Amino acid sequence: MATTNDLKNGMTLDIDGVLWNVVGFQHVKPGKGGAFVRTTLKNVLTGKVVDRTFNAGVKVDVATVDRREMTYLYRDGADFVFMDSESYDQIPIPPDVVGGTADYMLENTVATVALHDGAPLYVELPASVELTISQTDPGVQGDRSTGGTKPATLETGATINVPLFITSGEKVKVDTRDGRYLGRVTS
């Protein structure tokens, strides 16, 4: 148990049996009336984001979430198999838990897996990863009708927009949070 005054970004709360991550919070002390805390919460399972207001000092349940470093090994049917870096246990994780991070995972990718009561909640990759462009159309000199970008397919199968000068076979850095091209990787 903690109070709303102890909230921090990244905390996981158990509200009515549903797990929520604190994305943002603000303590508000109006001139009239009691203080309160405005929070932005993200549902751990569905990803839905809601705004919720708590009175200051109200007790909230903080869920115990174990964050472990794991290595993605392979796909087994629909499941993704991860290996715990400490215990070397192999854990199958369903695709709905892995979510959109699968677009940026290759074998032997190190990720952080959040577990609650031994069950995986979500998989978190580093902020950026380096991947190879498997297919993209050649950029035509002077073609600026598309804003200077073109679609490219990564080695994982995901599609991102890259600048016109990028060619197939090049390594690029990609933001795993929104799928943006960050830059070319130089050897």
UniProtKB/Swiss-Prot annotation:
Pathway: Protein biosynthesis; polypeptide chain elongation. CDD domains: S1_EF-P_repeat_1, S1_EF-P_repeat_2. The lineage of its organism: Bacteria, Bacillati, Actinomycetota, Actinomycetes, Frankiales. PROSITE patterns: EFP. Pfam families: EFP, EFP_N, Elong-fact-P_C. It comes from Frankia casuarinae (strain DSM 45818 / CECT 9043 / HFP020203 / CcI3). It comes from the Bacteria. Keywords: Cytoplasm, Elongation factor, Protein biosynthesis. GO terms for cellular component: cytoplasm. The gene is efp. This is Elongation factor P. It is found in: Cytoplasm. One of its GO terms (molecular function) is translation elongation factor activity. Belongs to the elongation factor P family. The keyword Chloroplast does not apply. GO terms for biological process: peptide biosynthetic process.
